[in-house]
Amino acid sequence: EPFQASQLDQMIQQDDSIYRVFDPQEGLNGARTSYFHKSVGGYHAAKPRALQNLFEYHLYQNNLQVMNMLNVKYVIQQDDEGNSYPAVNPDANGNAWFVDQLVPVSSANEEILKLKDFNSKTQAVVNTKEYPELTKLRYSVDSVASIDLVDYRPDYLKYSSNNSNDGFAVFSEMHYPSGWNAFIDGKPQDHYKVDYALRGMKVPAGQHEIEFKFEPEVVETGSQITLAANILLGLIIVGGLGFTLFRGKKEES
Protein backbone atom coordinates (compact mmCIF):
# COMPACT_ATOMS: atom_id res chain seq x y z
CA GLU A 1 0.00 0.00 0.00
CA PRO A 2 1.27 3.51 -0.80
CA PHE A 3 0.14 4.85 2.60
CA GLN A 4 -0.31 3.40 6.07
CA ALA A 5 -3.44 4.36 8.00
CA SER A 6 -2.61 6.50 11.01
CA GLN A 7 -4.53 6.73 14.26
CA LEU A 8 -6.06 9.93 12.91
CA ASP A 9 -7.33 8.10 9.81
CA GLN A 10 -8.79 5.33 11.94
CA MET A 11 -10.57 7.85 14.15
CA ILE A 12 -12.23 9.49 11.14
CA GLN A 13 -13.13 6.14 9.57
CA GLN A 14 -15.19 5.25 12.64
CA ASP A 15 -17.76 7.71 11.29
CA ASP A 16 -19.64 5.73 8.65
CA SER A 17 -21.76 8.63 7.38
CA ILE A 18 -20.99 10.34 4.06
CA TYR A 19 -18.89 13.48 4.47
CA ARG A 20 -15.67 15.10 3.22
CA VAL A 21 -12.28 15.64 4.82
CA PHE A 22 -10.08 18.69 4.26
CA ASP A 23 -6.38 18.83 5.06
CA PRO A 24 -5.14 22.42 4.56
CA GLN A 25 -1.53 21.19 4.63
CA GLU A 26 -2.14 18.99 1.57
CA GLY A 27 -4.48 21.40 -0.19
CA LEU A 28 -6.25 20.58 -3.42
CA ASN A 29 -4.03 17.69 -4.51
CA GLY A 30 -3.69 15.77 -1.27
CA ALA A 31 -3.17 12.16 -2.33
CA ARG A 32 -2.93 10.78 1.18
CA THR A 33 -6.24 12.20 2.37
CA SER A 34 -7.97 10.99 -0.80
CA TYR A 35 -6.55 7.49 -0.28
CA PHE A 36 -8.30 6.99 3.06
CA HIS A 37 -11.24 9.40 2.92
CA LYS A 38 -13.61 11.33 0.67
CA SER A 39 -11.49 14.44 0.41
CA VAL A 40 -12.69 17.80 -0.87
CA GLY A 41 -10.21 17.67 -3.75
CA GLY A 42 -11.16 14.15 -4.82
CA TYR A 43 -8.78 11.40 -5.89
CA HIS A 44 -8.27 12.36 -9.55
CA ALA A 45 -5.27 14.51 -10.44
CA ALA A 46 -7.28 16.55 -12.96
CA LYS A 47 -9.52 18.93 -11.01
CA PRO A 48 -12.52 20.86 -12.36
CA ARG A 49 -11.71 24.53 -12.77
CA ALA A 50 -14.61 25.50 -10.52
CA LEU A 51 -13.18 23.41 -7.69
CA GLN A 52 -9.74 24.95 -8.14
CA ASN A 53 -11.30 28.41 -7.89
CA LEU A 54 -13.19 27.47 -4.73
CA PHE A 55 -9.92 26.42 -3.13
CA GLU A 56 -8.08 29.55 -4.22
CA TYR A 57 -10.76 32.11 -3.34
CA HIS A 58 -12.48 30.49 -0.36
CA LEU A 59 -11.10 27.31 1.21
CA TYR A 60 -7.56 28.67 1.52
CA GLN A 61 -9.16 31.77 3.08
CA ASN A 62 -11.01 29.62 5.65
CA ASN A 63 -14.48 30.48 4.36
CA LEU A 64 -16.64 28.36 6.66
CA GLN A 65 -19.77 28.79 4.54
CA VAL A 66 -18.01 27.18 1.57
CA MET A 67 -16.64 24.41 3.78
CA ASN A 68 -20.18 23.80 5.03
CA MET A 69 -21.70 23.62 1.55
CA LEU A 70 -18.97 21.16 0.50
CA ASN A 71 -19.97 18.97 3.45
CA VAL A 72 -16.55 19.20 5.11
CA LYS A 73 -17.09 17.46 8.43
CA TYR A 74 -13.44 16.95 9.40
CA VAL A 75 -10.56 19.40 9.03
CA ILE A 76 -7.06 18.08 9.74
CA GLN A 77 -5.34 20.39 12.22
CA GLN A 78 -2.06 20.40 14.16
CA ASP A 79 -1.73 20.86 17.90
CA ASP A 80 1.04 22.84 19.63
CA GLU A 81 3.38 19.86 19.38
CA GLY A 82 2.79 19.42 15.65
CA ASN A 83 0.59 16.34 15.97
CA SER A 84 -2.31 16.05 13.55
CA TYR A 85 -5.87 15.60 14.78
CA PRO A 86 -9.32 15.72 13.14
CA ALA A 87 -11.23 18.85 14.10
CA VAL A 88 -14.98 18.27 13.76
CA ASN A 89 -17.02 20.84 11.87
CA PRO A 90 -20.49 20.59 13.45
CA ASP A 91 -21.99 22.98 10.89
CA ALA A 92 -21.38 20.93 7.73
CA ASN A 93 -24.52 21.13 5.60
CA GLY A 94 -24.73 17.42 4.86
CA ASN A 95 -25.30 15.85 1.46
CA ALA A 96 -28.36 17.88 0.45
CA TRP A 97 -30.68 20.53 1.91
CA PHE A 98 -33.57 22.84 1.07
CA VAL A 99 -32.99 26.60 0.86
CA ASP A 100 -35.56 29.37 1.19
CA GLN A 101 -33.90 31.96 -1.05
CA LEU A 102 -32.17 32.10 -4.42
CA VAL A 103 -29.67 34.97 -4.64
CA PRO A 104 -29.47 36.17 -8.27
CA VAL A 105 -26.22 37.24 -9.92
CA SER A 106 -25.42 37.88 -13.57
CA SER A 107 -21.93 36.43 -14.08
CA ALA A 108 -19.60 33.68 -12.88
CA ASN A 109 -17.37 36.30 -11.22
CA GLU A 110 -20.29 37.70 -9.24
CA GLU A 111 -21.29 34.17 -8.32
CA ILE A 112 -17.96 33.18 -6.78
CA LEU A 113 -17.56 36.54 -5.03
CA LYS A 114 -21.04 36.30 -3.53
CA LEU A 115 -19.93 33.19 -1.64
CA LYS A 116 -17.99 35.49 0.70
CA ASP A 117 -21.13 36.84 2.34
CA PHE A 118 -24.00 34.40 2.00
CA ASN A 119 -25.61 31.78 4.24
CA SER A 120 -25.12 28.43 2.53
CA LYS A 121 -27.83 26.75 4.63
CA THR A 122 -30.65 29.09 3.64
CA GLN A 123 -29.45 30.67 0.38
CA ALA A 124 -28.28 29.45 -3.02
CA VAL A 125 -26.45 31.74 -5.42
CA VAL A 126 -27.65 31.39 -9.03
CA ASN A 127 -26.57 33.01 -12.28
CA THR A 128 -29.93 34.11 -13.67
CA LYS A 129 -28.29 35.19 -16.91
CA GLU A 130 -27.37 31.53 -17.45
CA TYR A 131 -30.70 30.27 -16.08
CA PRO A 132 -33.36 32.93 -16.87
CA GLU A 133 -36.09 30.38 -16.12
CA LEU A 134 -35.26 30.59 -12.40
CA THR A 135 -37.63 33.46 -11.70
CA LYS A 136 -38.95 32.27 -8.34
CA LEU A 137 -36.50 33.46 -5.69
CA ARG A 138 -38.35 32.68 -2.44
CA TYR A 139 -39.33 29.26 -1.11
CA SER A 140 -41.01 28.01 2.05
CA VAL A 141 -39.06 25.44 4.07
CA ASP A 142 -40.94 23.96 7.02
CA SER A 143 -39.29 22.55 10.13
CA VAL A 144 -39.75 18.92 9.09
CA ALA A 145 -38.55 19.27 5.49
CA SER A 146 -35.84 16.72 4.76
CA ILE A 147 -33.74 15.37 1.95
CA ASP A 148 -31.51 12.37 2.63
CA LEU A 149 -28.89 10.55 0.57
CA VAL A 150 -29.88 6.86 0.55
CA ASP A 151 -27.60 5.41 -2.16
CA TYR A 152 -24.10 6.62 -3.00
CA ARG A 153 -22.04 5.25 -5.87
CA PRO A 154 -19.49 6.85 -8.22
CA ASP A 155 -22.02 6.95 -11.08
CA TYR A 156 -25.32 6.97 -9.20
CA LEU A 157 -26.85 8.97 -6.36
CA LYS A 158 -30.31 8.54 -4.86
CA TYR A 159 -32.06 10.82 -2.38
CA SER A 160 -35.35 10.69 -0.52
CA SER A 161 -37.09 14.04 -0.09
CA ASN A 162 -40.07 15.22 1.94
CA ASN A 163 -41.35 18.78 1.99
CA SER A 164 -44.80 20.28 2.56
CA ASN A 165 -44.17 22.96 -0.07
CA ASP A 166 -42.55 23.22 -3.47
CA GLY A 167 -38.87 23.67 -2.71
CA PHE A 168 -35.41 24.22 -4.08
CA ALA A 169 -32.74 21.73 -3.05
CA VAL A 170 -28.96 22.06 -3.13
CA PHE A 171 -26.82 18.94 -3.49
CA SER A 172 -23.25 18.87 -2.20
CA GLU A 173 -21.91 17.44 -5.46
CA MET A 174 -19.99 19.16 -8.24
CA HIS A 175 -22.16 20.34 -11.11
CA TYR A 176 -21.07 18.49 -14.22
CA PRO A 177 -23.71 18.69 -16.97
CA SER A 178 -21.80 16.56 -19.48
CA GLY A 179 -23.12 13.20 -18.41
CA TRP A 180 -25.02 13.63 -15.14
CA ASN A 181 -28.79 13.39 -15.64
CA ALA A 182 -31.35 14.07 -12.92
CA PHE A 183 -34.68 12.35 -12.27
CA ILE A 184 -37.57 12.81 -9.85
CA ASP A 185 -39.67 9.68 -9.39
CA GLY A 186 -38.12 8.28 -12.56
CA LYS A 187 -38.92 11.30 -14.75
CA PRO A 188 -36.14 13.52 -16.21
CA GLN A 189 -35.70 16.76 -14.32
CA ASP A 190 -33.65 19.89 -15.04
CA HIS A 191 -30.91 20.74 -12.58
CA TYR A 192 -28.76 23.85 -12.31
CA LYS A 193 -25.34 25.06 -11.26
CA VAL A 194 -25.67 26.91 -7.96
CA ASP A 195 -23.17 28.31 -5.46
CA TYR A 196 -20.67 28.47 -8.34
CA ALA A 197 -20.00 24.72 -8.37
CA LEU A 198 -22.84 22.67 -6.85
CA ARG A 199 -26.09 21.19 -8.13
CA GLY A 200 -29.51 22.68 -7.50
CA MET A 201 -32.99 21.48 -8.39
CA LYS A 202 -36.62 22.47 -8.00
CA VAL A 203 -38.41 19.76 -6.01
CA PRO A 204 -42.22 19.57 -5.84
CA ALA A 205 -44.06 19.26 -2.55
CA GLY A 206 -44.51 15.82 -1.05
CA GLN A 207 -42.37 12.71 -0.81
CA HIS A 208 -40.11 11.98 -3.77
CA GLU A 209 -37.21 9.87 -4.97
CA ILE A 210 -34.46 11.94 -6.59
CA GLU A 211 -31.76 10.31 -8.68
CA PHE A 212 -28.59 11.46 -10.42
CA LYS A 213 -27.23 9.06 -13.03
CA PHE A 214 -23.93 9.42 -14.85
CA GLU A 215 -24.83 8.67 -18.48
CA PRO A 216 -22.24 10.39 -20.70
CA GLU A 217 -23.14 10.59 -24.38
CA VAL A 218 -19.72 9.30 -25.42
CA VAL A 219 -20.39 6.07 -23.52
CA GLU A 220 -23.85 5.72 -25.04
CA THR A 221 -22.47 6.42 -28.51
CA GLY A 222 -19.66 3.94 -27.95
CA SER A 223 -22.14 1.31 -26.76
CA GLN A 224 -24.30 1.86 -29.83
CA ILE A 225 -21.28 1.57 -32.12
CA THR A 226 -20.19 -1.60 -30.33
CA LEU A 227 -23.69 -3.06 -30.66
CA ALA A 228 -23.85 -2.18 -34.36
CA ALA A 229 -20.39 -3.67 -34.92
CA ASN A 230 -21.38 -6.87 -33.11
CA ILE A 231 -24.56 -7.17 -35.17
CA LEU A 232 -22.61 -6.59 -38.38
CA LEU A 233 -20.02 -9.16 -37.34
CA GLY A 234 -22.79 -11.63 -36.57
CA LEU A 235 -24.37 -11.06 -39.97
CA ILE A 236 -21.01 -11.59 -41.67
CA ILE A 237 -20.44 -14.84 -39.76
CA VAL A 238 -23.96 -16.10 -40.49
CA GLY A 239 -23.65 -15.05 -44.12
CA GLY A 240 -20.28 -16.77 -44.39
CA LEU A 241 -21.63 -19.99 -42.90
CA GLY A 242 -24.63 -19.84 -45.21
CA PHE A 243 -22.44 -19.35 -48.24
CA THR A 244 -20.17 -22.25 -47.19
CA LEU A 245 -23.14 -24.59 -46.73
CA PHE A 246 -24.65 -23.50 -50.04
CA ARG A 247 -21.37 -24.05 -51.87
CA GLY A 248 -20.96 -27.47 -50.22
CA LYS A 249 -24.41 -28.59 -51.32
CA LYS A 250 -23.80 -27.28 -54.82
CA GLU A 251 -20.56 -29.26 -55.12
CA GLU A 252 -22.32 -32.44 -53.87
CA SER A 253 -25.01 -32.07 -56.50
List the model feature ranges, each with a label.
Residues E1-E173, W180, E252:
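Conserved luminal/periplasmic juxtamembrane motif of membrane-embedded glycan-processing enzymes
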Residues T122, V126-S253:
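Active-site-proximal, structured, solvent-exposed surfaces of multi-pass membrane proteins
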